[in-house]
Amino acid sequence: MPRDGTNEQRFLELPSPMSFILNILRNVLEYFGVPVDQDLLICQNKNCGSARSIVRIIGRRLPLKPCRRPHFELIPHVNSTESDDYELRVPSFADVLCVANDEEASCLRFRHSLWQKKEERKIAPFYPSKLTWDPSSPGLRQNKTETDDLPVNEAAIKKIAALEDELTFLRSQIAAIVAMQDLRESRETGFIDLSDEQVPPSSATTGLSVEPDHAPSVVLPPPPPPPPPPQFSLQPPSSLPMQPGSANTHDIDSLATEMERQLSGVKKTDDSHHSKSQRLRDVPNMLDVLKDVNKVRLRPVERSPGGRPVQKRKRRSSEWDPVSLISNALKQKFAFQDDSFDRENSSWECSPFSSPETSRF
């Protein structure tokens, strides 16, 4: 009997699960600073706001920064003929979908982003080229045009101007080099146009001599002199009488065409010589090929006392060896294609180390 009494007393002293949970809740509330006596008031009175639930009470006690709440104000379509006085109307929950994309919600703004100055509170007139967001017409989202101009960057304009100046300077340099090359060719061939003597120096040459500081790092080396063409007589044929006017121009044209033909022939011969020299360069030199012959080492081969190489005994593989099975199957399949015995790796060899044969078909 005393044992039963002690067991019953111990059972009564054990805490129930509900009391354990209540103790945990009270400790949590005391940790967050919530009075324990307020629990009964929460259960009896149905308060509103932050005292409606335990979660709200705990959240009110915690030092958390509240999130920013967006306030939506939908601006109606205002034409230029209408007045600036208007009333903002509150949108429905269907307009909240446009918040995901800021570009589509161009007509929405937060309350903290409103202009503070009174003169800036006026709404710009509605232009047909600038479309606003409309939930009923999703096709306008893709066809929206932007009329806002980008700010002008002065640094970019300066860079563009500098690049243009450098480009003009390079063009003048190229023109001067071409003119010098033409004069050199005409002097070498002995053909000088009389009309070129009275021409003043071109602007390209003057720009090259006056403005050398624009791009000092872009100075090009002088071109190599062209190969001298074969000499030919500049005198007109004696049978033709010299006439002022048409006869003189005819002789000049004939000389020019003859010069072009000879220059083309010289270019062809130069190209042929160049191609021949290139072919000779591509052919390998035998001295370079044979200079490393002494460094070649042969593989040592076992020889018999008579001097003949010792032939290795062929290993007889078992019937269940996978290498022998595969080799026998391949031999039976390709035996009819090549039955010659003079090949190094013939199909009749039973060595598993022989190289595979390639089919002719």
Curated annotation (Swiss-Prot):
Cleaved signal peptide residues: none
Location in the cell: Mitochondrion
Comp. bias intervals (Low complexity): 232-244
Chain intervals with Pro residues compositional bias: 219-231
Expression (tissue specificity): Expressed predominantly in testis (at protein level). Expressed to a lower extent in spleen.
Positions carrying Phosphoserine: S137, S304, S340
Keyword Cytoplasm in annotation: no
Alphabetical UniProt keywords: Mitochondrion, Phosphoprotein
Example GO biological process: aerobic respiration
A GO CC term assigned to this protein in UniProt: mitochondrion
Annotated Basic and acidic residues bias: 250-282
Keyword Cell cycle among UniProt keywords: no
Family note: Belongs to the MTFR1 family.
Task performed by this protein: May play a role in mitochondrial aerobic respiration essentially in the testis. Can also promote mitochondrial fission.
The protein, known as: Mitochondrial fission regulator 2
